[in-house]
Structure formats: structure tokens, C-alpha cells
């Protein structure tokens, strides 16, 4: 039977690790439905900008980059604010906010009033709400799932992510072809509403976090970064993950140009090349737990962290035809399988190393840094491709990735941190 402890933690339905508890089940369900909604609407805004508003490449690029970067900046003060609020109401509020602003797009389209500025504002609001939700969700997960089961929980989230990445875009593309360009945005909005209902159903008490100061001070905005950069265990993990993700994502637009333009692949071939390898994420996420049980967390973290950066340089050698398509799929499968192992292990270690009263600030700072780094590197690699050529820019990113294992943690952590004292929170 499920039970609720005095601290508001929902205990496991089944003893012995077979169940992660009713509360986690609802959290996982909420994550699943919103993730599938988001992947259904993958690249929906650029498509709407092109198909409905006749936007050119510069405006489409600005829409993607500005939404990411401005949303991240807007979210900076929200991490410290979320830390000292009950997390589930924050998650529900951000879900409902995303639902409302996304529904404004099909509504404006139906009324003939949709404009580029509205798409830009909606993308900024959704990006900021997404960062805020993730910060609160990390704290919620740590409260719902006991330490030894965190890896299993993160493995389930990772498997869900790659399943949605594999199935969502093709289904979304078919829906756009049948029903028009805004249908997937409406579906994404509904997914956030369902997510809010799932979080509401978690049940159990949630105590109000306590802090010494009654008001948020300007210095509190940097608390997350101060904690991460001062931690000898978290700092290398932070620098490695942010840089690797940024370099991988920076080449995504360049690969589209290379494959769809220079090499003449059809759009369906391009979609297939990146959809099928997502099976690697399912394989990797299922292997993470058994690998850690056999070889230990630190060894699996470092090995998968190294393996994930060995693949992207191969994308610089893609050629036309079936051989080129197979090369891309093989490289992406290896990359995604390695990431599928690495991500749940790294996410688990990050939560284990972060005191409960600092999780929201830490995750917010982490996500903001990741999004800003990705936006900056994407813009930089676009300029680099214009100067050196697309293939050369892809190769350079791959070579730089080979140096990133130097930033991986050298030593395993030995114990979980104790909660920091309220006075330290300012």
C-alpha cells in the first residue's frame, strides 16, 4: 500500500524496488504526455512561420534562437523563487501557462490574426516556463523517489524521451499534412493540460520550504551557479554536459543544410536518418541500471561520457545515396545509445550531490546555462559554416567534442550532501 510520510513523501507501493510508488507513477505519466505533445509539435513554429507567415531564413533562425535565449534569461530569477515555494503548484501553474499561450496560436490562426511577434512571444514564454518546470520537477522527483531508486526513475524518463523523439515528429508531420500547420500546437497545448492534471493527482502532503530571509535579494539570483561552480564534484559534470550538448546541437542545422541541400536527400530520408536511431536511446536507458549494478556508477558515467563524444566526428564524412544514409543512422545510433546510458546516470548523480534545499536553484542554473550555450554555439557554428563550409564546421565540432572527456569527473563521489542550513540561503 502507498503511504505518506510526515515530510510528505509518497512511499513505495511495493517494497523491494519493484515499484517506484503511486506518486512517481503520476509524475511519470505527466512527463510522458507532455513530452509526446512536445515532440508532436517538433519544429512547429518554424513551419508555421514559413507556411503561414512566409518568413525567410533570417526570421526563422531568429525565432528559434531568440525564443531559446530570451526564455533562458527570463527564467534566471525564477529558480531562486521556485526553491522556496511548494513545487507541485509551481509545476501545475507552468503547465497551465504553456497550455494557454500555445492555444493562442491556433485561435489567432483561425481568426486570421496570427503574426510573427505572437510566435516570438509564445516561444519565449514556453521556454521560460519549461526551465521553471524542470527546476521544480527535479525537487519533486527527489522527494518522491528514494535515493537508491533514482537511477531507475531517471532511466524511465530517458526511455520516454527517446520513444517520443522517435514517434512524435513523424506522427506530427502526418498530422500537419492532413489537418494543417497549427494542429500539433493545439495537441501540445492539450498535453500540458493533461500533465497538470497528472501532477495534481500525485496526492500526499507537500511541506512549505523554509528560508531565513523573507524577500528574494539580487544576490540570490546567482545561488545556483555559485553552488555548482564551488562544488568539486558538480563543476566538472556541469562544464562537460553543457559543452557537449551545445556542440552536438550546434551542428543540427548544419546537418540539415548538408543532407537536404548539398547531398540531395529527400525530407523523408532526413527524418528517417534521425528517427530510427532513437531506438538506441531506448537500449541505452534500459542498460544504465544493470551496467551501474555491475561496474559501479562512476565507471559507467565516465565510460558512457567518453563514448558519446566519439561518434559525431563521423558525420563530417557523410556522402550521398544509401551509403550516406546508413552512415548517419549508424553514427546517430551509437551516439544516442551512449547518451541513453549517460543521461540517467548523470542526472542521478546530480540529484545525489545536490542538497534538497538547493535542487531548484541548481537545476535552473544548469538548464539556463545549457540553453544559452546551445544558442550561442548554434549561432557561432552558423557563421563558421559560412566561412569554412558546412562539412568543415561539422568536422570541427566533432574534433572539439573529442577533447571534452577531460572535463569529466575524475573521482567517484563518496557520500550524499547534507542539507544546507537556512542561513546559507540568504
Where are these regions (language model features)?
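Alpha-helical transmembrane-bundle signature of multi-pass membrane transport and export proteins
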Residues: 1-426
Amino acid at each position: 500500500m502507498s503511504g505518506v510520510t510526515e515530510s510528505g513523501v509518497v512511499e513505495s507501493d511495493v517494497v523491494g524496488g519493484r515499484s517506484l510508488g503511486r506518486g512517481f507513477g503520476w509524475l511519470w505519466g505527466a512527463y510522458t504526455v507532455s513530452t509526446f505533445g512536445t515532440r508532436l509539435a517538433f519544429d512547429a513554429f518554424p513551419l508555421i512561420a514559413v507556411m503561414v507567415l512566409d518568413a525567410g531564413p533570417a526570421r526563422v533562425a531568429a525565432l528559434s534562437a531568440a525564443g531559446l535565449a530570451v526564455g533562458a534569461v527570463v527564467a534566471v530569477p525564477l529558480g531562486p523563487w521556485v526553491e522556496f515555494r511548494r513545487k507541485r503548484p509551481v509545476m501545475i501553474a507552468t503547465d497551465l501557462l504553456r497550455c494557454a499561450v500555445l492555444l493562442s496560436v491556433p485561435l489567432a490562426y483561425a481568426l486570421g490574426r496570427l503574426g510573427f511577434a505572437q510566435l516570438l512571444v509564445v516561444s519565449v514564454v514556453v521556454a521560460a516556463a519549461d526551465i521553471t518546470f524542470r527546476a521544480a520537477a527535479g525537487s519533486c522527483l527527489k522527494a518522491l523517489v528514494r535515493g537508491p531508486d533514482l537511477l531507475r526513475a531517471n532511466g524511465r524518463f530517458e526511455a520516454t524521451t527517446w520513444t517520443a523523439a522517435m514517434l512524435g515528429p513523424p506522427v506530427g508531420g502526418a498530422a500537419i499534412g492532413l489537418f494543417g500547420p497549427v494542429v500539433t500546437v493545439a495537441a501540445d497545448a492539450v498535453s500540458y493540460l493533461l500533465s497538470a492534471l497528472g501532477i495534481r493527482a500525485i496526492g500526499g502532503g507537500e511541506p512549505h520550504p523554509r528560508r531565513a530571509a523573507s524577500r528574494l535579494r539580487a544576490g540570490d539570483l546567482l545561488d545556483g551557479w555559485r553552488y555548482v561552480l564551488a562544488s568539486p564534484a558538480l563543476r566538472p559534470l556541469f562544464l562537460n554536459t553543457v559543452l557537449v550538448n551545445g556542440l552536438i546541437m550546434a551542428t543540427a542545422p548544419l546537418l540539415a543544410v548538408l543532407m537536404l541541400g548539398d547531398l540531395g536527400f529527400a525530407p523523408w530520408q532526413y527524418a528517417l536518418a534521425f528517427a530510427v536511431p532513437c531506438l538506441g536511446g531506448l537500449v541505452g536507458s534500459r542498460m544504465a541500471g544493470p551496467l551501474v549494478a555491475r561496474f559501479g556508477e562512476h565507471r559507467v558515467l565516465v565510460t558512457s561520457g567518453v563514448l558519446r563524444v566519439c561518434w559525431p566526428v563521423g558525420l563530417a564524412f557523410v556522402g550521398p545515396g544509401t551509403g550516406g544514409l546508413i552512415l548517419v543512422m549508424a553514427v546517430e545510433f551509437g551516439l544516442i545509445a551512449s547518451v541513453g546510458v549517460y543521461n540517467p546516470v548523470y542526472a542521478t548523480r546530480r540529484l545525489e550531490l545536490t542538497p534538497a534545499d538547493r535542487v531548484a536553484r541548481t537545476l535552473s542554473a544548469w538548464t539556463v546555462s545549457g540553453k544559452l550555450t546551445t544558442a550561442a554555439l548554434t549561432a557561432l557554428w552558423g557563421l563558421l559554416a559560412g566561412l569554412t563550409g558546412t562539412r568543415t564546421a561539422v568536422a570541427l565540432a566533432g574534433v572539439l567534442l573529442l577533447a571534452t572527456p577531460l572535463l569529466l569527473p575524475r573521482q567517484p563521489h563518496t557520500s550524499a550532501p547534507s542539507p544546507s542550513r537556512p542561513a546559507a540561503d540568504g
